[in-house]
A protein has these predicted regions:
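N-terminal soluble domains immediately following signal/targeting peptides that reside
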Residues: 1-154
């Protein structure tokens, strides 16, 4: 899952639209805004944080008129999702696809069952857009997994 916009620079007072994307290798489809899936969805600019005011089914999931200059971050954190694996083989196939290493051995060493076990996962996404002068710096929002730009690309 990732956040995607058509353009990464806009003029101030212009509308910014951002889609939630589901897929792999940056190929995927748009997902509408579903509040029951969202723990946090906000945007931040110039040290201020604003909640996203989307409604069920909105696509794009984010559409906001940005009135100030500055580097702008849109952040999405999902609620936990659960996936049941009937067999270890199914889990190993997933782990190999994601290149996670020798998970079967780790799984066993932690005393987890070989059948009918549950994976809990969350999704974290952030997109950076330059608005107007695009001044400012990226911020560490404390996501469990997060890239932080060391330099402003705009």
């Amino acid at each position: 899952m990732w956040l995607e916009t058509e353009t990464f620079q806009i003029d101030k007072n212009e509308n910014l639209e951002v889609n939630i994307k589901i897929g792999e290798k940056l190929q995927g489809s748009n997902r509408p805004y579903i509040p029951n899936d969202v723990e946090e969805f906000y945007w931040s600019q110039n040290g201020k944080k604003f909640n996203v005011n989307s409604r069920l089914g909105d696509s794009p999931a984010f559409s906001e008129n940005i009135n100030d200059n500055g580097l702008t971050s849109i952040v999405y954190i999902s609620k936990p999702s659960f996936l049941t694996y009937d067999t270890m083989e199914k889990f190993e196939k997933f782990a190999n696809h994601k290149d996670l290493g020798p998970v079967k051995k780790l799984h066993a060493s932690l005393g987890f069952p070989e059948k009918n076990f549950i994976e809990t996962y969350r999704r974290f996404a952030k997109v950076i857009v330059g608005v107007g002068s695009s001044s400012g710096r990226d911020t560490n929002f404390g996501l469990l997994i997060e890239f932080i730009l060391l330099n402003n690309p705009y």
